[in-house]
């Protein structure tokens, strides 16, 4: 995934669900300027209530928010968007104010104007956690010096999916722990 993102002029999409996949496919087949890579999962994912076909064209957008005065941003892509929303709902139950941003394409988000980037990832909110089941290096530009990234920076493991996800910290409990440690 990091290798694909490093290729100049290649739009890489890692959609969160069927709705984002439809949008990514549409953008791929209608693109006249750049090739596209769709990175899909074999997981059986639910369609998130907040995913939006039209907003995929911006590369990143708010998929969940429980308060206008949020102080935490969870940034996720692909199947991890489901995890981020589940963690946000649990954090909400604990009194936290959280925004979840789905990032189906870092390439497309990175070329948006500064005003849109600020709307999605306001500089004033520095408590940020990015979540992706891949190398972490793509995410530090979004979480900044005060944030954290939950990812995989070692060679993969082989086991049933649930066991691997737990081993690498892709659980609601781990996301909450990382968020709480940022306070």
Residue ranges and their predicted role:
Residues 1-31, 171, 176-178:
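Conserved thiamine diphosphate
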Residues 21, 30-183:
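Thiamine diphosphate
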């Amino acid at each position: 995934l990091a290798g694909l993102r490093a290729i100049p002029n290649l739009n890489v999409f890692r959609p969160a669900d069927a709705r984002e996949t439809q949008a990514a496919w549409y953008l791929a087949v209608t693109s006249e300027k750049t090739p596209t890579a769709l990175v899909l999962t074999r997981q059986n994912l639910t369609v998130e209530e907040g995913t939006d076909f039209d907003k995929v064209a911006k590369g990143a957008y708010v998929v969940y928010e429980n308060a206008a005065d949020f102080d935490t941003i969870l940034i996720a892509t692909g199947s991890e968007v489901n995890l981020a929303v589940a963690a946000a709902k649990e954090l909400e139950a604990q009194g936290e104010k959280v925004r979840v941003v789905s990032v189906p394409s870092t390439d497309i988000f990175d070329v948006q104007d500064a005003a849109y980037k600020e709307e999605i990832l306001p500089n004033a909110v520095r408590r940020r956690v990015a979540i992706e089941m891949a190398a972490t290096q793509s995410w530090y530009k979004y979480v900044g010096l005060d944030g954290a990234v939950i990812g995989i920076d070692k060679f993969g493991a082989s086991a049933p999916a649930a066991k691997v996800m737990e081993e690498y910290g892709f659980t609601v409990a781990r996301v909450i722990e990382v968020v709480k440690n940022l306070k």
